[in-house]
């Protein structure tokens, strides 16, 4: 399933206009409309840059805030749904979303330009910086884009795992420098050489993952459908699978904790069955957010989970830790979760 398909259901989203199919797909996106209530509409991604916050979401909206309470809309050159925003430093960042849209900023989010757009291509869900010049973007149905010039231009890359057609939902760089991608039907793939080559991991789960966080020196936390959370303390020790002949739809669920441990993972029992879409870490642990306003807190060792806040019914998509507070974004804009 698509990582953000839930938004089409809970948000009641519809196209801003009907397009004449005979005209073919547009060659460039339409600019997003400046909307007085943009801060109250669906926001899906949030990131900190310098002393401010940038959030992105429905209809290409990009918003900026100094305190997480008062938000101002920033002109956006694309009116497509934006799923994620990432910054390399205090100046350079990227927002990405539907129609393989990638927007770039070189001034800390004050202004944005179109770096990539293809109305015939798939939705993009996440992005990672490999170094100052090399970036990757991932998305639906195995979509994988490379940039070797700091994000100025992007090119698709085909490789065996991508050919499986599973959605790539999230990517992160672990503390040891390796990369981990999580996605549909339990997909986990790892790169030890800055994204040049990828290995398919033998996954402990057959449902979809929507997020991944670094954990410790070599580990990771992956989370997703129905509140499932798995932790590996050393991803480099997780066994791999051959891609040739692999069928993700033929896998049987693994219920035995010993078999899950043999794959290098352990289950974190969470007090929810709601799907979890976004997460962030602090020194005290991690916070994951999801359907119906669900908030799950993990301790620093990622061994125990709790729900420090009652769900309020409004789905949350992403969260960030800043100045001692957790700030989430979702169906009704930004929500201050407090210190938790």
Task: Briefly describe each language-model feature range.
Residues 17-340:
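Residue-level hotspots at or immediately adjacent to binding/recognition sites across diverse folds
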Residues 1-4:
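Positively charged n-region of N-terminal signal peptides that target proteins for export
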Residues 10-18:
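Hydrophobic h-region of N-terminal signal peptides that target proteins for export
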């Amino acid at each position: 399933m698509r990582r953000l398909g839930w938004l089409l259901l809970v948000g009641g989203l519809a196209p801003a206009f009907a397009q004449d199919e005979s005209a073919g797909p547009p060659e460039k996106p339409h600019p997003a409309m400046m909307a007085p209530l943009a801060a109250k509409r669906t926001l899906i991604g949030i990131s900190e840059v310098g002393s401010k916050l940038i959030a992105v979401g429905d209809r290409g909206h990009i918003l900026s805030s100094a305190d997480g309470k008062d938000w101002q809309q920033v002109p956006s050159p694309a009116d497509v749904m934006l799923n994620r925003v990432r910054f390399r430093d205090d100046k350079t960042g990227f927002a990405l979303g539907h129609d393989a849209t990638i927007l770039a900023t070189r001034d800390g989010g004050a202004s944005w330009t179109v770096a990539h757009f293809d109305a015939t291509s798939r939705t993009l869900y996440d992005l990672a910086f490999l170094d100052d010049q090399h970036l990757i973007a991932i998305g639906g149905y195995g979509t994988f884009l490379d940039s070797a010039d700091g994000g100025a231009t992007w090119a698709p890359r085909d490789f065996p795992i991508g050919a499986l057609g599973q959605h790539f939902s999230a990517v992160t760089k672990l503390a040891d420098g390796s990369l981990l991608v999580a996605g549909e039907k339990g997909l986990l793939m790892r790169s030890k050489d800055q994204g040049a080559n990828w290995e398919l991991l033998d996954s402990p789960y057959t449902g979809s993952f929507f997020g991944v966080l670094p954990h410790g020196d070599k580990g990771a936390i992956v989370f997703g459908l129905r509140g499932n959370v798995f932790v590996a303390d050393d991803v480099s020790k997780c066994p791999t699978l051959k891609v040739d002949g692999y069928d993700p739809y033929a896998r049987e669920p693994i219920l035995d904790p010993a078999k899950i441990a043999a794959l290098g993972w352990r289950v974190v029992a969470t007090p929810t069955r709601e799907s979890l879409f976004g997460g962030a870490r602090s020194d005290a642990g991690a916070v994951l957010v999801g359907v119906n306003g669900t908030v799950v807190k993990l301790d620093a060792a990622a061994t125990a989970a709790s729900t420090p806040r009652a769900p309020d019914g409004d789905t949350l998509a992403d969260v960030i830790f800043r100045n001692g507070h957790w700030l989430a974004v979702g169906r009704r804009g930004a929500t201050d979760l407090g210190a938790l």
